[in-house]
Amino acid sequence: MVKKLWLVILSALLCSACSKPTGHITLNFSFVVDNDSLRLDTCMYQNAAGNLYEVNDVQYFISKVMLVDDAGNTFDIIDNQGIHYVDIRIPGTLRWNISDEIPVNHYTRIAFLFGLEGAQNTTGYFPNPPENNMSWPDMIGGGYHYMKINGRWIDKAGVRQPFNLHTGKIANNTGFADNTFTVTLPLEQFTVSKNSNSKLTLQMNVNAWFTNPYLFDFNIFGGSIMQNREAQEVLRANGGDVFSVK
């Protein structure tokens, strides 16, 4: 009799857990340069170091995405292993319709890892494009680029020079520095409601990569930084101010 009673109680608890209301979220991705929407292929921007520049491509990975509620409880996104690839020239990547059944709640923060780590950042993890087009050379760590921003800047002689801001693992004195970093952003009045789809927009300010706490000057670092440890570390440090949620 006692055993049967426990089975009834357990079944009731399981049913209660299964019936908790859930909703969905859609994460959109946008790009600005300070207060203006990013326009590609137009040399109209100036960074804090005084470099005039244009942007031709922006591509990046985020991973380990999670929501945090009022009580500090976290909900880890498992759709696509918590990874999303963004390419400004591929409209389908600028919207992530997350398939997870997310508990109805008020969420105060969203957090994610900029880049990839562990098994997700090993060569061959992504078998198909466009993600596998982000492959990072095995000789300097393998895996994948975390970000590519390609464009041109005008150097001190007034000549338009190409730049490729490519970040990823890079060799250091003890092995490889992964150069990932965690971003945590506050959410204002964001609620997931039952059977509804709540929307967030993750906005990248391209100019912020060059600003704080360190100035990034193309005339100092040049246009190619894949094996430039100092330049990679500057971008990593500056990444804390790059993203906001709208």
Task: Name every feature range the model reports, one short phrase each.
Residues M1-L5:
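Positively charged n-region of N-terminal signal peptides that target proteins for export
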Residues L7-L10:
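Sec-dependent N-terminal signal peptides
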Residues L14-A17:
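C-terminal motif of bacterial Sec signal peptides marking the signal peptidase cleavage site
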Residues S19-K246:
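A short, solvent-exposed, low-complexity linear motif enriched for acidic/polar residues
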